Structures are given as C-alpha cells and as structure tokens.
From Swiss-Prot:
Residues 22-28, 45-80, 95-113, 134-151 form a propeptide. This is Cardio acceleratory peptide 2b. The gene is Capa. The keyword Signal applies. GO terms for cellular component: extracellular region; extracellular space.
C-alpha cells in the first residue's frame, strides 16, 4: 500500500515537472484578449454636443477652420498610409454648421436662465430650520419664566 502511494506521488511529481503547460505568472494581465487597447483616438467629436458657452464658442471657431467637410472630401488611401498603427473611430453625430449654431444659442440661453445659469444653486436649503420646533409650548413657557428682562 505504501509503495503504491509512493508511486502515485512520484508519477504526479514527474508529470508536473515535465509538463509543457504555461507557467509564466509574470505575464501582463492586460493582454489583447481583455479588450483594452492602448492607442490614440483618431477623429474629432461632435461640437454640437457642447454643454457650456465656452464649449459652444470653441465649436464655432472649429467650424470656421474645418467648414462643412463630408466623407467624400477625404482620400482613404492617404489615411491608410499615414495612420497604419491608429484605430479610427467613427465621427458620431457630425452635424452641419446650423446645428452647431443652435447649440451655441442654447448655451447662451442657459447662461441667461436663472435656474440653469452660472449662479444656479443645487436646490438644497442651508438656512435655519423652518417649521415645527422640537421644543413644545409648555416647556418653552417654563424656560421663559426663569429669564429676567434687561432694561
């Protein structure tokens, strides 16, 4: 029985020693199979999604620089040569200049609106407590009897 147990332990040890399984534990856990790629993003975001007046003004400046560009204006062969290591993202929501102007006007309106402007509060009240006090009327009368008025 002991020799059988020794043989089994010896076989398991030999299999573990000479197995060709991968034993590299220092491997980078963020490999390609994790879905995370380190690369710069290519393309520009939609300026019509500006959420403040400053972003709206920047979008207007960019509109003057880029103008109304369409997909036909770009030569794909040039981009494939220059950006071989870059991953291209679609330009989501690329609207025309009119939509960017509407976004700018909406940002102006929000600045002028008291509820959403720069002085808008969070709606929380930090003043004194209003409403029913924790002191009832009887104990309040007892406390006021002991006080003396100063003239």
């Amino acid at each position: 029985m002991k020799s059988m147990l020794v043989h089994i332990v010896l076989v398991i040890f030999i299999i573990a020693e000479f197995s060709t399984a991968e034993t590299d534990h220092d491997k980078n856990r963020r490999g390609a199979n994790m879905g995370l790629y380190a690369f710069p993003r290519v393309g520009r975001s939609d300026p019509s999604l500006a959420n403040s007046l400053r972003d709206g003004l920047e979008a207007g400046v960019l509109d003057g620089i880029y103008g109304d560009a369409s997909q036909e204006d770009y030569n794909e062969a040039d981009f494939q040569k220059k950006a071989s290591g870059l991953v291209a993202f679609p330009r989501v929501g690329r609207g025309d200049a009119e939509l960017r102007k509407w976004a700018h006007l909406l940002a102006l309106q929000q600045v002028l609106d008291k509820r959403t402007g720069p002085s808008a509060s969070s709606g929380l009240w930090f003043g004194p407590r209003l409403g029913k006090r924790s002191v009832d009327a009887k104990s309040f009368a007892d406390i006021s009897k002991g006080q003396k008025e100063l003239n």
